[in-house]
Amino acid sequence: LGAKYVLKNRSDLRIYKEFSFEYLKSLLGAYPVLGTKVPLKGRIVTFVGATGQLFLPYWLQDFLYFGYTDDIINLFDIKQNERDIANAPAYFKREYKYCTGEDMCREVVPEIYITKMFLSKYINIDDSVKGFWECIKNYFMIVDWEDLSAVLFKYDSYNRNDGDTNGILNWKESHRMISHSICVSIINGYLKYGDWMEKERFNYILHGKKE
């Protein structure tokens, strides 16, 4: 493509903070890739999620990806998913009386599919939080919405943006998002994995109610 870096984002996503591109490039310099099994020039940068994804393996948001051009091309050089699901929320409401984080991981929603298919080209992955965190530590970086003054039209967030968030941070389990600070804590080894984390996705109720 002739460009060293590329930012891939949704067409309804707006970034308003000046020098955002310089900030994203600086993250690649400050946090080099730690692992050697996945051939990346630098980390792949994604946004913090709209729901708590800290314990949902391989759920990295697809609102935005930033990195070296060759790395982002490689990220999307994966087999196309042939499932005929036009509307994921409608599908889950139809198929599940209540939907848990485990259901979302088992069904492999698009964001998870991209991450898992990319990584599985180079390493054996399982659906464990431990493996997920190891990949975050080695290959990814998360930025917060306010880092880029980002606003997303989806979820009517233009009408609910308060200047610091993009309007979506009131979602369930928002306290368990993989924020930038959480990501850095994982990378630097201060946030420690525990076996109890593997069961947490069963407690995420993303819609419906247990009877």
Show which residues each predicted segment covers.
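ER/Golgi luminal nucleotide-sugar-dependent glycosyltransferases, focusing on the catalytic module
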Residues: 1-9, 13-211
